[in-house]
Amino acid sequence: LISHTSTIVPFFFGMLTAYFVYDKYADKSTPFLSFALFIGIAMSITAFPVLARIIQEKGLTKTHLGTISLASAANGDITAWCLLAVVIAIAQAGSMLSAVYNILFSVLYIVFMFLAVRPFLRMIGHIYHNKEVIDKGLVAFIFLLLITSAYLTEILGLHALFGAFIAGVVMPGNVKFRKIMTEKVEDVSLALFLPLFFVSTGLRTEIGLLNKPELWWLCLIFIVVAIAGKFGGAMFSARFVGESWKDSLYIGALMNTRGLMELVVLTIGYEMGILTPSVFAVSYTHLRAHETAANLVC
């Protein structure tokens, strides 16, 4: 309940905010629904890796508060990924019927990955159950699977990012296998792709566009709406399920952590032409300010 409420409440707050800013700041060729959905999803995600790091540094990993916060963030991220997939399918479709087709094919693809690909990968996981090292051929195969899955979802009308995510989800549940593969993937992604992504995002962000007081006011509104939606949704739902007011306040603050995933959502919206350069700059600035404030509070 906490995870879904803390995702859905800021999502609708974001859509409501989009209603008031659409006429003035959105591209006239962009449908309102696509614009509102992207603003909503960008405000509704909790940065799970950032939250996990904060909980670890504060020594809350094995506490009741830390467990609830991490579980809520993990479930909320899954909800956000599903919402993002639907949002992209709707935004890329020319009509509602096309959006339904995109969503239907995407569901079929997910079913195929879980019913056909996952059992095959589980067999591989059993083979490497007690091994400390994975051979290069298997590593190459896993990378090929990630790329293929990303390419197929791009064809189906979703973003390539979603396909890579699904490929990661269907990996064998073997903890040792996942740990080794995570290290292999991170060797490439953290050292090469992530810095390039930040460079690309920095080049896209035109802070100079924020040259009017009204845009800075819009940035402040985004910050307030995002914090209020996330904090309120998490806090009141935590209180509803029986948590104390103190723990509910802590959960609301912890669920307000922001990070890379929000930036990915904004970048996708910008690449698809749904977010204008000025809205992207405002959203990026609000994200950085929100992330800094949340980390200081936590």
Regions found by a protein language model. Give the residues of each.
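Membrane-interface junctions of multi-pass transporters
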Residues: 1, 123-221
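The feature identifies polytopic integral membrane transport proteins across all domains of life
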Residues: 1-5, 26-43, 53-74, 180, ...
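Transmembrane alpha-helical segments of multi-pass membrane transport proteins and ion-pumping complexes
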Residues: 7-15, 19, 45-49, 81-85, ...
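Hydrophobic alpha-helical transmembrane segments in multi-pass integral membrane proteins
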Residues: 14-18, 81-86, 146-158, 197-209, ...
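Membrane-interface helix termini and inter-helical loops of multi-pass transporters
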Residues: 22-29, 90-99, 206-214
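Structural signature of hydrophobic alpha-helical transmembrane segments
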Residues: 33-44, 102-111, 156-167, 217-226
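C-terminal ends of transmembrane helices
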Residues: 49-60, 119-128, 170-183, 234-242
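Conserved small/polar residues in nucleotide/adenosyl-binding loops
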Residues: 285-292
